[in-house]
Amino acid sequence: MNKCWCALAIVLTLAAIQANPTAQVTDEQAPPTFRARFETSQGPFVIEVHREWAPIAADRFYTLVRRGFYNDARFFRVLNGFMAQFGLNGDPKIQGEYATANLLDEPPKQSNLRGFVTFAKESSPNTRYTMIFINYKDNSYLDADGFAPFGQVVSGMEIVEKLYSGYGRQNVPDQRRIKSEGNAYLTAEYPKLDFIKTAQIENTK
């Protein structure tokens, strides 16, 4: 797969929003290291987060998991040999709370290797907010574009690689409709998508 196309794909799948890192959403400070366990329609996997890698991202992820934001969220974009993306809440009202709650950019301290977890963003500055992707392979070329990993799948990567990818690159759900219609849209038009049953903080170190 063309590397430039892959980087562009992550950018283009984000709906255009105005960067506003001062929006009224307060994130908790995450522990230095913690794990989040995801129970999915395919089985469980665990992400270990190291706050020192990307503190702003770690705090947002920690807050979202603790608030149950990812519960019942769909893996709406899964591309074999590239990545699995999720992070839009199934309730438009809840998703709307983060519409302008963007995060300031952080320089990558780790590389986008297989199993590493990163917030998606646009090409313009400070556009990370709730969407995340898990790298399926060495995508280290994304580092130069500012995609900063904050964690790594430490258990269940085989589950992540089983997520439904049959809709491919052409028949990708419309993110604007996910935001405005939620899971009702995805259930009706993309019924085979795998989803997160629950996501919970597993332990702290």
Q: Residue spans of the language-model regions?
A:
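Cyclophilin-like peptidyl-prolyl cis-trans isomerases
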Residues: 4-7, 13-205
